[in-house]
Amino acid sequence: MGSEQNDSTSFSPSEPKLCVKGCGFFGSPSNMNLCSKCYRDIRATEEQTASAKAAVEKSLNPNKPKTQPQQSQEITQGVLGSGSSSSSTRGGDSAAAPLDPPKSTATRCLSCNKKVGVTGFKCRCGSTFCGTHRYPESHECQFDFKGVAREAIAKANPVVKADKVDRI
């Protein structure tokens, strides 16, 4: 009797199911019976299609700069008491806020191709280097340090020439 209760309350071991796409790997129910690779591929394509749709919608409906007549129309709509239209215009403004473009940071030394991560040194020539190649002499920098310094000094200290004195 006791064993019957344990059998009914415990989970029966089920055989692992193969991936639905038929790649040969085992799928899991949490991934819609797909293996991890197929699931990751499907998610990536879904994200790409969603971003493509958003880009198409954005190109079809470009954001126009606000001008005075449009602002006056929004004010008149707000005065008329249509709270739903004023809230919808606010929601549209927050969605139209420009996104910051992703920064492309160099994570490898230009000379030895070593990963530098956060500890990379940025040279005035515009490249990132590791601790060994951070000095201009070690990475054969083509940046003209002397020329830039001369220009900075000349700009900071303008030459003052006195007028010539007329002889009597």
Swiss-Prot record:
It comes from Arabidopsis thaliana (Mouse-ear cress). This is Zinc finger A20 and AN1 domain-containing stress-associated protein 1. The keyword Endoplasmic reticulum does not apply. A zinc finger (A20-type) spans 13-47. Zn(2+) 1 binds at C19, C23, C35, C38. The gene is SAP1. A zinc finger (AN1-type) spans 103-149. GO terms for molecular function: DNA binding; zinc ion binding. It comes from the Eukaryota. Coiled coil: none annotated. Residues 60-76 have a biased composition (Polar residues). Residues 49-105 are annotated as: Disordered. Keywords: Metal-binding, Zinc, Zinc-finger.
